[in-house]
């Protein structure tokens, strides 16, 4: 039995399995198959699978007369790119937008409408570079972020996010194409000392005081960030970057695409999340879940600890090298309170800290002292975490910190019992495969 002899339901199932390209070929066989291959329900499946759209929209977001026509318009608009790469980039942005919609709509509102092929051509001509295919596509879908907004929260809405330690604040935005051009032509070449690398362009930067930028090598497709002495560090494993200028096949992946995909994965899995401080929300790059975040509970006191590599103040050419990390400590008292010898206390207060600092599994320092950053947090049962950040340098790429906090039940002014130690489980401070 041939396809023409199959029932409508069987034919629909078969066509949905063979995909849009083969369905278009089947439509050329006979009038009956052409009718079946043009059904809206069929092309709605193709649009959903390939483009994640549930209504017929063209690439500009405008309504199309049918799902089939919408699919055709998408294919025509992106005909100069491998289709599998188009679908992958679309999925990358869809995942990021979906997360932002649910968790950080203020940042989603800063995403700009994608650029045109003419915009990309003008950009490449002006800077005399050839963008990797995945990066071109990323900008076809989204032209970075608006860097100004009426709410005055510009420094906190970066898509990549950031961290803080003492007075060192970072919040990284994905730059729109016009800012990539301006930063590359003006600030970057004049101020940052990389002018010999003419294939480098500025793709992302922190808009707050700290100097942190991300640079794309348009020839190799690798993404870099700089250290305090202008050394370039790859932000993505080199082995993963390939075929960045190949218009054929489906193996193209540059560091920008890999970087944003990994960032989206961390957001979606809850590895990193939005933090609100002083009524200002931002994406915090401090990991929130194991194994990159340690979690321990002692006598009702929970302590979470994690770190972020700080390349912009590191100096890897020092002897010994200085790998700098920010670390975040979050402590809270569980709803049942502090439990000592069977007695529940509704509060406890920090008195003392003890750190054991290791590099390459060897103890390099023991730190003992009162308070943390000059504070003695009073924890109340069931209330929000007390959070503090600090930073430290290591002579190697692999370090860790563990130790303990000494608390007093009740408060320091009105103790309700003897001091007790709260364990801080070891957390890593290591040079990561992906640098954000």
From Swiss-Prot:
Keywords: Ubl conjugation pathway
Record-annotated membrane-spanning stretches: none
Lineage: Eukaryota, Viridiplantae, Streptophyta, Embryophyta, Tracheophyta
Gene name as annotated: SKIP16
Biological pathway: Protein modification; protein ubiquitination
Domain F-box: 75-111
PROSITE patterns, alphabetized: APAG
The protein's name in its UniProt record: F-box protein SKIP16
SUPFAM superfamilies membership: ApaG-like, F-box domain, SMI1/KNR4-like
Domain of life according to the entry: Eukaryota
GO CC terms in record: SCF ubiquitin ligase complex
UniProt-listed InterPro entries: ApaG_domain, ApaG_sf, F-box-like_dom_sf, Knr4/Smi1-like_sf
Residue ranges occupied by any ApaG domain in the UniProt entry: 295-436
Domain notes for this protein: The F-box is necessary for the interaction with ASK proteins.
């Amino acid at each position: 039995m041939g396809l023409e002899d199959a029932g409508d339901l069987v034919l629909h199932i078969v066509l949905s399995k063979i995909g849009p390209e083969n369905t278009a070929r089947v439509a050329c066989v006979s009038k009956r198959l052409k009718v079946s291959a043009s059904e809206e329900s069929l092309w709605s499946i193709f649009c959903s699978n390939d483009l994640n759209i549930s209504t017929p929209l063209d690439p500009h977001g405008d309504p199309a007369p049918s799902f089939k026509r919408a699919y055709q318009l998408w294919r025509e608009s992106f005909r100069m790119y491998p289709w599998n790469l188009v679908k992958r980039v679309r999925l990358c942005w869809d995942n990021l937008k979906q997360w932002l919609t649910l968790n950080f709509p203020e940042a989603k509102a800063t995403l700009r409408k994608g650029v045109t092929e003419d915009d990309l051509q003008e950009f490449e001509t002006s800077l005399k570079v050839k963008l990797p295919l995945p990066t071109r596509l990323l900008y076809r879908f989204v032209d970075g972020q608006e860097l100004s907004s009426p709410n005055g929260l510009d420094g906190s809405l970066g898509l990549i996010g950031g961290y803080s330690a003492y007075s060192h604040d970072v919040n990284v935005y994905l730059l729109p194409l016009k800012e990539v051009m301006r930063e590359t032509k003006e600030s970057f070449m004049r101020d940052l000392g990389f002018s010999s690398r003419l294939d480098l362009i500025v793709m992302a930067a922190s808009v707050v005081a700290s100097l942190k930028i991300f640079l794309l090598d348009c020839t190799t497709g690798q993404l870099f960030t700089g250290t305090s002495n202008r050394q370039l560090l790859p932000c993505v494993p080199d082995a993963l970057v390939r075929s960045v200028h190949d218009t054929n096949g489906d193996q193209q992946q540059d560091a920008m695409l890999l970087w944003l995909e990994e960032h989206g994965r961390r957001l979606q899995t809850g590895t990193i999340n939005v933090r609100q401080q002083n009524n200002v929300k931002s994406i915090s790059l401090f990991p929130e879940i194991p194994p990159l975040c340690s979690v321990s509970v002692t006598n009702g006191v929970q302590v979470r600890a994690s770190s972020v590599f700080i390349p912009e103040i590191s100096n890897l050419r020092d002897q010994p090298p200085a790998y700098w990390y920010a670390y975040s400590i979050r402590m809270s008292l569980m709803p049942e309170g502090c439990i000592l010898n069977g007695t529940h206390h509704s509060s406890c207060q920090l008195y003392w800290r003890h750190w054991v600092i290791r590099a390459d599994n060897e103890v390099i320092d023991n730190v003992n002292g009162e308070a943390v950053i000059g504070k003695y947090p009073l924890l109340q049962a069931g209330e929000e975490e007390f959070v503090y950040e600090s930073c430290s340098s290591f002579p190697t790429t692999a370090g860790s910190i563990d130790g303990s906090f000494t608390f007093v039940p009740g408060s320091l002014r009105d103790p309700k019992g003897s001091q007790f130690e709260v364990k801080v489980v070891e957390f890593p401070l290591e040079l990561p495969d992906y640098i954000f």
